Amino acid sequence: YRRQRQMCIRDRNDIQAECVELNFSTCQGHVVELANLLVAYFRKKDYDVKKLKGSINYDFFNKMLTRGKEKGDMVQTAKALIEAIQPLPFYRVLNVNALSLNNAGAYISQELGYALAWGNEYMNQLTDAGIPAATVAKKIKFNFGISSNYFLEIAKFRAARMLWANIVASYHPECLRDCDNKGANGECRCAAKMA
């Protein structure tokens, strides 16, 4: 099984990883292994890691929501995943798949509220485990569903960005690098950007 996955990654010589965002999904039990494979592959191919963007779909809460199953310890897996993907600074590995709420019939306000609570739970548990708030916030990716109500969907995305920035700011994330996007107290504003 592992050999098959390695071959799948190896056979992707025609993909320009620096030009397109790559998003991967795998079994929840193998996300750390996938992260290690990706880091090794990108290093072997001499990619500029600052140009690589993408995600690994690790969503602990979605598994419980859709199947009623809890697999493993979320905090331990998330910490190992964040550590494994550290060489790829623009890869997000903690997903909030609010799409499943939308597909289950949630209204726009319900989807938005639950998604933000979901993201806040990641922030809460992982900052309590000792991971800096700026690091956690930069590793979360939101996947929203889109309904046919055009103007309310636009409003949902704008509200999500604003509300997520407020949630992240409440954790007082410290900027881990020298950037021009610092707040009044050295707060990391780039951590609050939603992907």
Describe these PLM feature segments.
Residues R2, A17, A137-K139:
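A general secondary-structure signal for short beta-strands and their flanking turns/coil
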Residues Y1-I9:
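Single conserved hydrophobic/aromatic residue that forms the stacking wall/gate
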Residues R10-C19:
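Alpha-helix-loop-beta-strand connector modules within alpha/beta enzyme cores
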Residues L22-A195:
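Helix-rich catalytic cores of soluble enzyme domains
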